[in-house]
Amino acid sequence: MPKLKTKSGAKKRFKVTGTGKVVYAQAGKRHGMIKRTNKQIRNLRGTTTLFEGDAANVKKYFLPNQR
């Protein structure tokens, strides 16, 4: 049986670290930031780790070759 293909949308959104955690960029910084405070915008910077249950599903179904 051939290897499963990685979902191309998922490989743009998620990254698996060396320790196996899944990180992603937070949503909400594309447009409409005039109504947000500077603190809210600042807190959306950088990447965040997915919760373990969600990370397991992402690795199983969307990133099968990244385990």
From Swiss-Prot:
GO cellular component: cytosolic large ribosomal subunit
PROSITE patterns given in the database record: RIBOSOMAL_L35
Keyword terms of this UniProt record: Ribonucleoprotein, Ribosomal protein
Gene3D superfamilies: 4.10.410.60
Top-level division of the source organism's lineage: Bacteria
GO MF entries: structural constituent of ribosome
A GO BP annotation: translation
InterPro entries recorded: Ribosomal_bL35, Ribosomal_bL35-like, Ribosomal_bL35_CS, Ribosomal_bL35_sf
Signal peptide residue numbers: none
Alphabetical list of NCBIfam families matching this protein: rpmI_bact (TIGR00001)
Family listed: Belongs to the bacterial ribosomal protein bL35 family.
PANTHER family linked: 54S RIBOSOMAL PROTEIN BL35M, LARGE RIBOSOMAL SUBUNIT PROTEIN BL35M
Protein name: Large ribosomal subunit protein bL35
Record organism: Methylorubrum populi (strain ATCC BAA-705 / NCIMB 13946 / BJ001) (Methylobacterium populi)
